A protein has these predicted regions:
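Transmembrane signal-anchor hairpin modules in multi-pass inner-membrane enzymes, especially those
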Residues: 1-8, 28-45, 67-69, 113-129, ...
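Alpha-helical transmembrane segments of multi-pass inner-membrane proteins
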Residues: 16-25, 38-82, 86-162, 360, ...
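A membrane-periplasm/extracellular boundary helix in multi-pass inner-membrane enzymes
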Residues: 59-66, 142, 159-214, 230-235, ...
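Membrane-interface anchor segments at the N-terminal boundary of transmembrane helices
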Residues: 90-102, 282-306
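Hydrophobic, aromatic-rich transmembrane alpha-helices
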Residues: 105-120, 297-320
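Loop-to-helix entry and N-terminal half of a specific, functionally important transmembrane alpha helix
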Residues: 126-135, 281-285, 289-293, 305-306, ...
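Transmembrane alpha-helices of multi-pass inner-membrane enzymes
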Residues: 152-156, 168, 302-312, 328-392
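Long extracytoplasmic/lumenal interhelical loops at the membrane interface
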Residues: 211-226, 230, 234-294, 316-319
Length: 400
């Protein structure tokens, strides 16, 4: 409200500005040490727990959303809005919990950052692979297909950083696991409906509701594309329409009376179910989002930025011997690679993209600066030298 919004939107560009501000802030932050950067994957994992409680609470008890929203924004607004429109008992849709996927991804990345694949068969590391599977299960339990896709890309990027082209060997294993899950569904097991929705793109005897809702989501995205190029793109093709929108538009999703009024206004509009998402700068389609907000000019710069992100992160790990790759390198490439690919293929939201990408690339940049100064650092006092973590092949005592 201090920023002028009357609903849950209206000033999305403020979040973008905050995300972008991490570039100069983290780049110039004093006192950031080598060992601090190696703790980032652990901090990321611990931070993923923050959203769990409020999102679970507001998913299963949607009426608590307005109360939680007063102090924290990590609530399931979609479930609250669906309840206002009559989704009692969940008969209108499958409840999805994105915080579970965030936790699962962070768990998998923490394992891969601190425990390289070549050590997994050691007796004290046999728990790592089950934890990676658990991370994938949490992504599936979230109900979001794009998180399954991104988790797979994150695992591949992390393994590429430590075992290079041997990481391609995981592809047959992943395909076999997918076929096994599909073959057992409906015959030996009935997986939770959210898992079935997330995995419905694979062959299998999936629940009709899960398949239907997933297909409807795909069709919905196609309508987003059609409407954007039909009615919105030509309005500002070069520079886009900006990030600001009328904040009163978002009120229809959280106010029962306004929702009914909006439904009457939408009568006869074949794009009524997708129009508000474009107008509120939340089209769920990456290419549409960047063209809508910044136009062709901004899209050219954005694509160049994305290519630079991938080149910089992969170059960092490629020029480092596999046994010497550090946790911050693994974490950075595992964050950047899936989110860039997913933005252009399965799901794209510019705000969420920048919130994750800007800190990740800046922390990797700080690491590279420190690495360049390592000879000078190692020439310092023995106390300073002993403060550096051991190479990846010899983990510190706390993780060995």
């Amino acid at each position: 409200k201090l920023l002028g919004g009357t609903g849950w939107g209206g000033r999305r560009y403020f979040k973008v500005a905050l995300a972008a501000s991490t570039l100069p802030l983290l780049s110039s932050f004093p006192g950031l040490k080598w060992q601090d950067l190696q703790k980032v994957p652990l901090a990321y994992f611990l931070g993923s727990f923050v959203d769990i409680v409020p999102e679970l609470l507001t998913t299963f008890i949607p009426a608590t959303a307005p109360l939680v929203w007063r102090v924290y924004s990590g609530v399931n607004l979609g479930e609250y809005g669906a309840t206002l429109q009559g989704n009692y008992g969940g008969e209108q849709g499958i409840s999805r919990i994105g915080a579970l996927a965030k936790l699962g991804t962070a768990m998998g990345l923490a394992c891969l950052c601190y425990f390289p694949p070549r050590t997994w068969l050691r007796p004290d590391r046999l728990w790592v692979l089950p934890n990676l599977i658990l991370g994938g299960l949490l992504c599936a339990l979230s109900g979001f297909r794009n998180y399954i896709f991104r988790y797979g890309l994150a695992l591949f990027a992390a393994m590429f950083a430590t075992v290079r082209f041997q990481s391609f060997l995981i592809l047959p294993l992943v395909a076999s696991a997918a076929l096994l899950i599909g073959a057992t569904q409906g015959k030996l097991f009935n997986y939770p409906i959210t898992v079935q929705r997330a995995l419905s793109f694979m062959p299998g005897n999936w629940d009709f509701k899960a398949v239907h809702e997933a297909k409807a989501s795909t069709d919905w995205r196609k309508k987003i594309d059609d409407l954007f190029y039909k009615e919105y793109f030509d309005k500002a093709p070069l520079l886009g329409q900006g990030y600001h929108f009328d904040p009163s538009l978002s009120m229809a999703a959280t106010d029962a009376f306004l929702a009914v009024a909006q439904a009457k206004m939408n009568e006869g509009d074949e794009y009524a179910d997708v129009r508000s998402f474009i107008e509120m700068r939340q089209p769920h389609e990456g290419p549409v989002h960047i063209l809508l907000v910044t136009g062709v000019v901004g899209a050219v710069f954005f694509v160049t930025f994305c290519v630079a992100l991938l080149l910089y992160s992969f170059r960092s790990v490629i020029k480092t011997p596999p046994r010497e790759v550090t946790p911050i390198q693994i974490w950075s490439v595992s964050i950047l690679f899936p989110i860039v690919v997913a933005f252009f293929t399965v799901f794209g939201d510019l705000t969420n993209f920048l919130i994750q990408v800007c800190p990740a690339i800046t922390l990797l940049y700080r690491f590279e600066l420190l690495r360049q100064s390592l000879p000078q650092l190692h020439a310092s006092t023995p106390e300073e030298m002993s403060s550096f973590p051991a190479p990846h092949s010899a983990p510190p005592a706390s993780t060995s």
